[in-house]
């Protein structure tokens, strides 16, 4: 099975440090960055907006050999993807998307149109929401299990619309009568479904609908039993599921340089998590998020966050998102990624600050090493 690599696009903000609380390159809300302020000497805007910066990151990822880019939750990833499709030629866009944001029939039509305009470069990172406070702020008052039920029904309808000229559905949350895609869009490729979640309701949805089941990084041996369970559940559905890994990287020329620079940045946090990270972890009901939090909760010493070869569990102390990341030389990082690949992972969603420069560096220095490394074992995938 071939390996695919995605690069995360920093839709929120970006900067040279793990934490962007102090140093950043602006954000989509037109806050000027304190690194590249976007101002002319007379104080006027230079007309360069944050989406222009994101476009540079996307072009860098494409140039560096990444197959696609993740557009995480943030200021409307759909619109950003439509803009970036005009700036790139082959880069696929993995759009983070929640069922609560729109009705499934309309989402299917939106996806088909974007597939048509981008020549089939759209995939979905279907998320269900792991922060009840954030969900309520969007008008979503369903509990954890109900949200996954909605996601499952949402994907039932998407599948039905794509596979039938007319489709009706009668679920607990959604109903549809004689729905259809516009005739001229019916032949567009259905977006691939990249899905994650550790709870039982999440695994049920994954078994029925996921093309790629995503995990946050943990020690390989900790992930193997969980992957095996997903494989068995998918097999009962007669489906094949591939496995993916989301992981932040901190790569330098040498391993010593990587750990030294990371320690320096960690010390600047003064033992305090970033504002966004603290708000994210304190209100989450995500089972997968709880697994990540357990690796760093109540741990303040840098060395105590080292949980395996080149594995460090302190990334979430600087920013929201994955806790465990890879730290080391380009060769170290490539070796660890190859180990995950040999354990059955064929999709990798990578990231590193600053995203523009690191896309080029990782693409040039790390990806070729992973692609050239011999496969040590057969991939662990669900078989039809």
Model-derived features with residue positions:
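An alpha-helical appendage that flanks or caps ligand/catalytic pockets
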Residues: 2-45, 138, 144-189, 218-341, ...
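Hydrophobic faces of well-ordered beta-strands that scaffold small-molecule active sites
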Residues: 3-9, 68-71, 92-97, 122-126, ...
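Active-site beta-loop-alpha junctions enriched in small/polar residues
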Residues: 10-12, 74, 98-100, 127-129, ...
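Catalytic domains of carbohydrate-active enzymes, especially glycoside hydrolases
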Residues: 47, 52-72, 205-213, 339-346
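Conserved, mostly hydrophobic/aromatic
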Residues: 61, 65, 84, 114, ...
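Active-site-adjacent beta->alpha loops and helix N-cap segments on the catalytic face
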Residues: 76-81, 219-234, 355-361, 365
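Alpha-helix-loop-beta-strand connector modules within alpha/beta enzyme cores
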Residues: 78-98, 150-152, 235-239, 243, ...
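Glycine-rich anion/phosphate-binding loops
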Residues: 101-116
């Amino acid at each position: 099975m071939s390996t695919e690599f995605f690069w995360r696009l920093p839709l929120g903000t970006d900067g040279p440090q793990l934490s962007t609380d102090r140093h950043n390159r602006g954000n989509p809300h037109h806050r000027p960055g304190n690194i590249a302020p976007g101002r002319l000497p007379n104080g006027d805007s230079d007309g360069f907006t944050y989406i222009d910066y994101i476009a540079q990151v996307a072009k860098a990822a494409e140039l560096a050999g990444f197959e696609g880019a993740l557009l995480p939750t943030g200021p409307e990833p759909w619109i950003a993807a439509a803009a970036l499709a005009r700036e790139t030629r082959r880069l696929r866009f993995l759009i983070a998307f929640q069922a609560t944001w729109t009705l499934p029939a309309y989402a299917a039509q939106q996806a088909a149109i974007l597939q048509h305009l981008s020549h089939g470069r759209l995939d979905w990172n279907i998320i269900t929401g792991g922060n009840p406070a954030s969900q309520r702020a969007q008008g979503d008052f369903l509990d954890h299990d109900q949200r996954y039920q909605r996601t499952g029904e949402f994907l039932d309808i998407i599948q039905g619309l794509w596979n039938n000229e007319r489709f009706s559905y009668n679920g607990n949350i959604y109903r549809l009568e004689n729905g259809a895609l516009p005739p001229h869009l019916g032949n567009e490729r259905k977006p691939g479904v990249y899905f994650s979640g550790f709870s039982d309701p999440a695994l049920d949805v994954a078994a029925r609908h996921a093309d790629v089941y995503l995990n946050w990084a943990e020690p390989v041996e900790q992930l193997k039993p969980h992957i095996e369970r997903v494989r068995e559940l998918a097999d009962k559905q007669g489906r094949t599921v591939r496995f993916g890994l989301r992981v932040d990287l901190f790569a330098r020329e040498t391993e010593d340089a990587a750990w030294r620079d990371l320690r320096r940045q960690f010390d600047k946090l003064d033992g305090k998590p970033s504002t966004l990270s603290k708000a994210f972890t304190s209100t989450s009901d995500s089972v997968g998020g709880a697994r990540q939090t357990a690796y760093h909760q109540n741990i303040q010493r840098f060395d105590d966050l080292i949980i395996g070869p080149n594995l460090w569990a302190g990334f979430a102390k600087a920013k929201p998102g994955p806790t465990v990341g890879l730290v080391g030389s380009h060769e170290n990082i490539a070796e660890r990624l190859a180990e995950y690949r040999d354990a059955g992972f064929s999709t990798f969603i990578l990231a590193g600050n600053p995203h523009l420069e690191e896309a080029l560096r990782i693409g040039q220095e790390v990806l070729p090493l992973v692609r050239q490394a011999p496969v040590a074992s057969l991939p662990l995938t669900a078989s039809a």
